């Protein structure tokens, strides 16, 4: 059963009363670790908790505090190790199993995270960490209503803790109204959370509270805060196809898009979520007032953005209305901005790299086109999560989740995975360094660690038939820090698949309604390959 935001405010008030001077004497004296954690001094908290665990190995509380602190530091490998040890030692602790499930999720949906979450709630149906883990698992599977219920229940159980409120703010939940989002943001900000992933959620919460009036006034016809665009002609009753010639800049597909009657060239970006992003010099052509401010994020961190509203948009003959536009100071040559793939989430999108065209198909019978004569194809399911696409692949035999990003050129391994893949190889063939300078969207982070090696790896798309794509490990980067720990995804992404991987196919199809990815290829182009090879 859902609780109302007004009841949530009552819970917060009740918690505040519990901390009144009259009752404070009845509460146990907080430990040094707890005080450091509450103050946001996570480094000190880790030291205090580690010392407490060493001094009292049979005590559960300092172990739980240490795991929470490591998670806030986004030191998930150590958090996972501590959580596994705690769940093994304290088998009847719902907290230990719940935190272990969350650590497994952060590690990339690895292991038995569902089993651990279920074990937590079997021991205590109201366990905070078990509810959060169950909600995260439901969200990953697209069951937003179940996730919503879990996060509300967790927030009701511990209104003084920020994780539940934060998850409600980043949840893609169509039942959350702007008014409710504003109220939750106020509760969340009052708790003043520190560490991971709260820095980004705090930015989001401030954007919501500061701009609520503007959003309410200009997008009042929308039921939800996030999704404010809707097609004029859904085309769900019959099959409708439209082909458009796209201008490929290198391997990037540039779609012709009309906004308020003005032509724009937008890069089709499956990693761009549900945004229409215009570079500011191009956005000026629309002569639209800035309605509000928000933060947008990319490999360069975050940057502040203006929010605009356009009345109409057309993509390959498909019209849309009530268009939310965000702006960026970034620039890409010969383009006006980015078309987030989630805008076309009712369509089947086929990119033909030989004909240099894109085919958009709508309707109940829409699907990938049949392979051309002599071609083969494989179809893989993808997870559709916060507007981005993820497929499970293997790199040199290691299973992992890969982000599909048509807005990126190179396919990139994370530093963590690259180090694992290159372990034991001659050191003279491997170099590390730090790159500085502007990269893509975002302006808050201009440093990226990298590894350069003389070895290649392969991405295994499928086992039957065996299909591989080569990847150059010189393209490794710090995905662990710059991509994975976002407030929305918050799980380990080991591989970033850019257009350099897609163009090994003749055609690729993104079937958004059915969550399917189809690679059409010629036999020699995607063939079995041996293990890591020296170049």
Predicted regions and their residues:
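N-terminal leader/linker segments that initiate helical-solenoid repeat arrays
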Residues: 22-65, 72
